[in-house]
């Protein structure tokens, strides 16, 4: 690309190739913000891909929104692989990032490598995400050395909810904010291509974003991060309860209830199927 040719926009850009981690880095240099959504199945992944969402996260939040658990802890690597494969098969442009679930990397670098390799070989992921700062640096370095792109995740780390004492905002005190910044810088030095900041004060999200050269992705981290992510069911108004940081852009729960009710009423009344929906 010549110096006179503008870089393609990250959101809604060309569908001729996959978004890469280099594209995300270039977007930060340009000051271009971008969206990320979760996806767990082929149909929604295809819709989001067609909508121009540049990064899709196959999140361990599947534990709650797909499998019905009350935390992310129970979901397994064997659960995550087919979900990742479905999203990868259904998309042409979005960078597909898969969460390393609880228990799949904490034992050390070797376990992390084995788990990430499965998500990439069997699931088709182009990158993986893991939670934690200083305590997972060895895992991050091993993954990056093996050629596996890694997205970091600090702040509220749901896999550690039992240690954190619940789903609470992190980094409110000066000491806690400094610890988060230290973790973020360590992750950057270890080679992550981006860092998720979850449930931290807006000022902390802004400062970490300012000090890192890699993109930050906010979820409840204020307006100044380089990107924003939401669980798609929260974004679309399907979840029954959402956090303060969630904005719902549709009321999918009500639409689905209305559709199911209309279908049921027509079946009971004998008006579906009608001639239009029957074979001659």
Curated annotation (Swiss-Prot):
Annotated catalysed reactions: 3-methyl-2-oxobutanoate + (6R)-5,10-methylene-5,6,7,8-tetrahydrofolate + H2O = 2-dehydropantoate + (6S)-5,6,7,8-tetrahydrofolate
GO molecular function annotations of the record: 3-methyl-2-oxobutanoate hydroxymethyltransferase activity; magnesium ion binding
Function, as annotated: Catalyzes the reversible reaction in which hydroxymethyl group from 5,10-methylenetetrahydrofolate is transferred onto alpha-ketoisovalerate to form ketopantoate.
Co-factor remark: Binds 1 Mg(2+) ion per subunit.
SUPFAM superfamilies registered for this protein in UniProt: Phosphoenolpyruvate/pyruvate domain (SSF51621)
Xref: NCBIfam families: panB (TIGR00222), PRK00311.1 (NF001452)
EC number from the UniProt entry: 2.1.2.11
Pathway named in the protein's UniProt entry: Cofactor biosynthesis; (R)-pantothenate biosynthesis; (R)-pantoate from 3-methyl-2-oxobutanoate: step 1/2
Binding site for 3-methyl-2-oxobutanoate: 60-61, 99, 129
Pfam families xrefs: Pantoate_transf
Cofactors demanded by this protein: Mg(2+)
Assembly, per entry: Homodecamer; pentamer of dimers.
Gene3D superfamilies membership: Phosphoenolpyruvate-binding domains
Superkingdom of source: Bacteria
GO BP annotation list: pantothenate biosynthetic process
Active site: 198
Enzyme category, top tier: transferase
UniProt record similarity statement: Belongs to the PanB family.
Chain sites annotated for binding Mg(2+): 60, 99, 131
Stored PANTHER family: 3-METHYL-2-OXOBUTANOATE HYDROXYMETHYLTRANSFERASE
Statement: the UniProt record of this protein carries the keyword Transcription regulation: no
Name used for this protein in its record: 3-methyl-2-oxobutanoate hydroxymethyltransferase
């Amino acid at each position: 690309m010549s110096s006179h040719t503008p870089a393609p926009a990250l959101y809604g850009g060309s569908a001729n190739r996959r978004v890469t981690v280099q594209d995300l880095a270039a977007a930060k240099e340009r000051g271009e913000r971008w969206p990320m959504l979760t996806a767990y199945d082929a149909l929604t992944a295809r819709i989001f891909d067609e909508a121009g969402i540049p990064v899709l996260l196959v999140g361990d939040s599947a534990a709650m929104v797909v499998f019905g658990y009350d935390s992310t802890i129970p979901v397994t690597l064997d659960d995550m692989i087919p979900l990742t494969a479905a999203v990868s098969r259904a998309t042409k442009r979005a960078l597909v990032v898969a969460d390393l679930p609880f228990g799949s990397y904490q034992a050390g670098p070797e376990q992390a490598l084995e788990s990430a390799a499965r998500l990439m070989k069997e699931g088709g992921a182009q990158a993986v995400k893991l939670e934690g700062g200083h305590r997972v640096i060895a895992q991050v370095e091993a993954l990056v050395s093996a050629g596996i792109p890694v997205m970091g995740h600090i702040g509220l780390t749901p896999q550690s909810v039992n240690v954190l004492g619940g789903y609470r905002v992190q980094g409110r005190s000066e000491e806690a904010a400094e610890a988060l910044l230290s973790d973020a810088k360590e992750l950057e030095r270890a080679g992550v291509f981006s860092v998720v900041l979850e449930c931290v004060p807006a000022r902390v999200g802004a400062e970490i974003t300012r000090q890192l050269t890699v993109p930050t992705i906010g979820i409840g981290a204020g307006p100044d991060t380089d990107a924003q992510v939401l669980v798609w069911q929260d974004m679309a108004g399907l979840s029954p309860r959402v956090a303060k940081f969630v904005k719902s852009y549709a009321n999918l729960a009500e639409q689905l209830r209305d559709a199911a009710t209309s279908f049921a009423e027509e079946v009971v009344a004998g008006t579906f199927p009608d001639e239009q929906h029957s074979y001659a």
